[in-house]
Amino acid sequence: MGLLERLRKEWFIVGIILVIAAAKLEPTVGVKGGPLKPEITITYIAVSAIFFNSGLSLKTEELTNALMHVKLHLFVQLFTLVFFPTAIWLFLQVLSLTPINEWLLKGLQTVSCMPPPVSSAVILTKAVGGNEAAAIFNSAFGSFLGIVVTPLLLLLFLGSSSSVPFTSIFSQLFMTVVVPLIIGQIVRRYIKDWLERKKPPFGAISSCVLLMIIYTTFCDTFSNPNIDLDTFSLVVIVFIIFFIQLAFMLLTFLFSTSKNSGFTPADTVAIVFCSTHKSLTLGIPMLKIVFVGYEHLSLISVPLLIYHPAQILLGSVLVPTIKSWMLSRQKALKLTRQPKIPL
């Protein structure tokens, strides 16, 4: 495979590197109040576009069937909002004995308390060909659940309390997730034949929107003068984040593929991504609300800012491997279910 062909195939990873570099060179473009106006273009337009796109591309019957998959939804929500933060808290009891910056460690705990993302898990599940409808439901449901659960978890593990405006966050999520999804489904009914004939690149469109989200996030990071990190702590945190993601992806994979799990290979794909991914678009505003007035807010935010692109990068790299496994597993299951021809 030639270099250009390889770059074309891995364009999303290349895009992540380029947008981070662009944010580093000129962060003022994508900061809040800057020319791109991310407080509008990202918070409302970008997230709405991702879910309108999903509503347009998803068959209604697939979305309806996903609502009934209670066992899968229960697994994902319990893993991401109960097991994840508890396991990280235990892990941090050991890490607190090391010279790693204590505020970065607190940041790791805040990452664990976040709900599933409203975009990346859906996009990666779609890229693999997994149960996209289940991923969408868990992303939306997890986000709404996170409005109440995440502040309570932060209070439990970090002792931070604040009057969180549940109503405004809930209404914002409803307008940017549920409404665009429904509108997308309605529009699909009228242009269904055209969509099936033309097959628009829905996955690529969502990925481009996600690159914009990453760009503005890093613009905020690089333009913040309060972030003062020692190289050792930063490198160790990056390593720990990748370790956590790989370990939890493997754990959810083993659980969901166990003999009596009852999950299909497509379900496993949605479970692996939805259970281990954490929301940045909901997480950063939530941290700003819960940790209002904290001088170390920027340091606490760093692990989440690293975790978000790391989960996309790692997920993108693993897409071909997971897709290959899913297809081979589906083929094997299909063969075992075929009736044997009597001799």
UniProtKB/Swiss-Prot annotation:
<comment type="similarity">
    <text>Belongs to the bile acid:sodium symporter (BASS) (TC 2.A.28) family.</text>
</comment>
<feature type="transmembrane region" description="Helical">
    <location>
        <begin position="235"/>
        <end position="255"/>
    </location>
</feature>
<feature type="transmembrane region" description="Helical">
    <location>
        <begin position="271"/>
        <end position="291"/>
    </location>
</feature>
<keyword id="KW-1133">Transmembrane helix</keyword>
<feature type="topological domain" description="Extracellular">
    <location>
        <begin position="93"/>
        <end position="116"/>
    </location>
</feature>
<feature type="transmembrane region" description="Helical">
    <location>
        <begin position="38"/>
        <end position="58"/>
    </location>
</feature>
<dbReference type="GO" id="GO:0005789">
    <property type="term" value="C:endoplasmic reticulum membrane"/>
</dbReference>
<feature type="topological domain" description="Cytoplasmic">
    <location>
        <begin position="59"/>
        <end position="71"/>
    </location>
</feature>
<keyword id="KW-0915">Sodium</keyword>
<feature type="topological domain" description="Cytoplasmic">
    <location>
        <position position="138"/>
    </location>
</feature>
<feature type="topological domain" description="Cytoplasmic">
    <location>
        <begin position="256"/>
        <end position="270"/>
    </location>
</feature>
<feature type="transmembrane region" description="Helical">
    <location>
        <begin position="11"/>
        <end position="31"/>
    </location>
</feature>
<feature type="topological domain" description="Cytoplasmic">
    <location>
        <begin position="320"/>
        <end position="343"/>
    </location>
</feature>
<keyword id="KW-0333">Golgi apparatus</keyword>
<feature type="topological domain" description="Extracellular">
    <location>
        <begin position="32"/>
        <end position="37"/>
    </location>
</feature>
<feature type="transmembrane region" description="Helical">
    <location>
        <begin position="202"/>
        <end position="222"/>
    </location>
</feature>
<feature type="topological domain" description="Extracellular">
    <location>
        <begin position="292"/>
        <end position="298"/>
    </location>
</feature>
<keyword id="KW-1003">Cell membrane</keyword>
<keyword id="KW-0472">Membrane</keyword>
<keyword id="KW-0406">Ion transport</keyword>
<feature type="topological domain" description="Extracellular">
    <location>
        <begin position="160"/>
        <end position="163"/>
    </location>
</feature>
<dbReference type="Pfam" id="PF13593">
    <property type="entry name" value="SBF_like"/>
</dbReference>
<dbReference type="GO" id="GO:0006814">
    <property type="term" value="P:sodium ion transport"/>
</dbReference>
<dbReference type="InterPro" id="IPR038770">
    <property type="entry name" value="Na+/solute_symporter_sf"/>
</dbReference>
<dbReference type="InterPro" id="IPR016833">
    <property type="entry name" value="Put_Na-Bile_cotransptr"/>
</dbReference>
<comment type="function">
    <text>Involved in teeth and skeletal development. Has an essential role in the biosynthesis and trafficking of glycosaminoglycans and glycoproteins to produce a proper functioning extracellular matrix. Required for extracellular matrix mineralization. Also involved in the regulation of cellular calcium homeostasis. Does not show transport activity towards bile acids or steroid sulfates.</text>
</comment>
<feature type="transmembrane region" description="Helical">
    <location>
        <begin position="117"/>
        <end position="137"/>
    </location>
</feature>
<feature type="transmembrane region" description="Helical">
    <location>
        <begin position="164"/>
        <end position="184"/>
    </location>
</feature>
<feature type="transmembrane region" description="Helical">
    <location>
        <begin position="139"/>
        <end position="159"/>
    </location>
</feature>
<dbReference type="GO" id="GO:0000139">
    <property type="term" value="C:Golgi membrane"/>
</dbReference>
<feature type="transmembrane region" description="Helical">
    <location>
        <begin position="72"/>
        <end position="92"/>
    </location>
</feature>
<keyword id="KW-0769">Symport</keyword>
<feature type="topological domain" description="Cytoplasmic">
    <location>
        <begin position="185"/>
        <end position="201"/>
    </location>
</feature>
<feature type="topological domain" description="Cytoplasmic">
    <location>
        <begin position="1"/>
        <end position="10"/>
    </location>
</feature>
<keyword id="KW-0813">Transport</keyword>
<keyword id="KW-0739">Sodium transport</keyword>
<keyword id="KW-0256">Endoplasmic reticulum</keyword>
<feature type="transmembrane region" description="Helical">
    <location>
        <begin position="299"/>
        <end position="319"/>
    </location>
</feature>
<dbReference type="GO" id="GO:0005886">
    <property type="term" value="C:plasma membrane"/>
</dbReference>
<keyword id="KW-0812">Transmembrane</keyword>
<protein>
    <recommendedName>
        <fullName>Sodium/bile acid cotransporter 7-A</fullName>
    </recommendedName>
</protein>
<feature type="topological domain" description="Extracellular">
    <location>
        <begin position="223"/>
        <end position="234"/>
    </location>
</feature>
